[in-house]
Amino acid sequence: MKAKEIRELTTAEIEQKIKALKEELFNLRFQLATGQLENTARIRQVRKDIARMKTIIRERELAANK
């Protein structure tokens, strides 16, 4: 997901997506440990998406404090 798409979402929607991505990341790591994961790049992609979403939430918090 791109930052532009994330910025169009509300903070609550972003937090829901973060929760879903964290669950997916947990499952991907589990698959990696058991040798079932085929697309290892997906782990990195999910981590980056979570980081993007957290960054945008933080930007909104800082903007609200000014």
From Swiss-Prot:
What InterPro entries does the database record attribute to this sequence? Ribosomal_protein_uL29, Ribosomal_uL29, Ribosomal_uL29_CS, Ribosomal_uL29_sf
Record-level Gene Ontology MF annotations? structural constituent of ribosome
Swiss-Prot/TrEMBL keywords: Ribonucleoprotein, Ribosomal protein
* GO BP annotations, alphabetical order: translation
Could you confirm whether the keyword Protein transport appears in this record? no
Q: Which Gene3D superfamilies match?
A: 1.10.287.310
Name the UniProt record assigns to this protein: Large ribosomal subunit protein uL29
Task: Say which species the protein is native to.
Answer: Geobacillus stearothermophilus (Bacillus stearothermophilus)
